[in-house]
Amino acid sequence: METTTPSSALETHRDRPESSPQDLEDFVVEFWGVRGSIPTPGQETIRYGGNTSCLEMRVAGKRLIFDGGTGLRALGDSLAEQMPLEAYIFFTHYHWDHIQGFPLFTPAFTPGNCFHIYGAIPPDGESMKKHFIERVLHPNSPIPLKGLQADLRFYELKAGDSLQLDDGIEIETGQLNHPNTAMGYRVTWKGRSVVYCSDTEHLPDGLDDNVLELSRGADLLIYDAMYTDDEYHNPKSPKVGWGHSTWQEAVKMAEAAGVKQVAIFHHDPTHGDDFLDDIERQVQAVFPKAIMARERAVVPVGG
């Protein structure tokens, strides 16, 4: 393991075969975990899913994984027949719901696999690798560091950094408004782009310029819309300052940034399928190309 610094039409997938080489030649997003805070299995979350944050971008023959919530376990299991493999993992931040799937990510235990792991320098100034490992391995899980047999390479990022992968894949970063900080990502390839902004809270006096600039003209904006406006401002239990936003603010940002499609993401654990269906109707009434993030849903990007 090493730490380095880098240079500056929704389709359900539950009954679909595992991704083919042709899939990897294009640009698609697949959702593996769409919840916030805590996994929520049960009868009320069957249609949207109960795993915490994890999504995969397959672009130009490469796998880019964003966040490692409990959805990462299922993603890892789906890759079991494709080893050895190389992939890139990007973390927005290190709260539990974005890292708790890593100790159950089977490919990390397999010799011959290689993972390039990117994340922000922690607020306390310690190395990203140390900060990450201490949270996902012993004593917080029974897994010792030596159990991870894959080649893990760590790269530290600062908000505003950008990097180039092979085949013309560009990745840009931006600061998000979240306790202990978080980082948003924009992935661009052949003029098509996806922006991933989770977790982030809108500002009280206008749009967040960091998110706005990162999102301008994107084909798809995946946005933290954990609450409704009514929940966010509820005088009995306000959510102001908790680091999350609303679907109404997602629409405002999408319209201001001129994005083509917005995905409502990071669903509250109390929001069951019927509640999310109702949000979908409301958001599509004002932004027809909006979608609700669902586990195992695949979204083609541009094209």
Predicted ranges, named:
Residues 197-199:
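DG-centered beta-turn motif at the end of beta-strands
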Residues 201-295:
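Cap/insert and terminal regions of metallo-dependent hydrolase folds
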Residues 2-195, 206, 211, 277-303:
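Binuclear metal-dependent hydrolase catalytic cores
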